[in-house]
Amino acid sequence: MRVRHFLQFKDLSLAELEYLFERTRWIKDKFKRYERYWPLEDRTLAMIFEKPSTRTRMSFEAGMHQLGGAAIYLYTRDSQLGRGESVEDAAQVISRMCDVIMVRTFEQDIIQRFAGSSRVPVINGLTNEYHPCQILADVYTYIEQRGPIRGRTVAWIGDSNNVCNTWLQAAEIFDFKLNVSTPPGYEVENERMNSRAECFTDPMAAAKGAHLVTTDVWTSMGFESENEARKRDFQDWQVDAEMMRAARKDALFMHCLPAHRGEEVAAAVIDGPQSVVWEEAENRLHTQKALLEFLLLGKIK
């Protein structure tokens, strides 16, 4: 079987993503009924972290265990990668000792180079450019809660970061409308825009009539020196009750977490009845289990 990687959302086709969601439903049902499912027994996942994480580590490590396999945590500072070993050499060695690799790092180029030298599937656990595993869970969560996402409207409010970039790819694949509103100076790069996306200078206009409103922190990891400036620049881009009223009455709210209540989202929203952030976070576990199964075993008949 050809080695497949998941480095950005569009690495998988619509048909493959829909298949993953079918498997997610089945695997999640097994989990909820406490039924053992060990398709990856004796398989090993290597998890390489340059950026720290809670949800990414927990979901991959627990997920691999629940599929019957094992997970090894590697922090770059504690390995030869942190002492100058080339990405290519590390990929050659690590991929000969495990069955699948998840990398969470800063630059997309690093994970591309790693995959280029790996003998096994490589998964993007997050880079500055993309966060495909997050949007896998987000799209699945919307479908689980509200049905097909095709033809719906998603409002992205805030920074044009890795999560936003991945929503842009998802909109094109799943054929939904993406309204993007960012402060001046934080706009989406022109080359990332597509026919399913529209930019708004007014966040309320972006949220109007949306089926889903979603956001992320104003200051992503690696941009901490800009924190005070960003707080000033983003103050009108908080998702609050008024913004949710502009969306549809049955609109959902999502956030990839961790969240800063009182900044990018009001406490009344993230802790309110339209919020599905906890379901969204849990679904990282289930969608990634389906992804691991697919990358290692292909389609299960």
Model-derived features: positions:
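Structural/interface elements that position substrates and couple domains in central-metabolism enzymes
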Residues: M1-K301
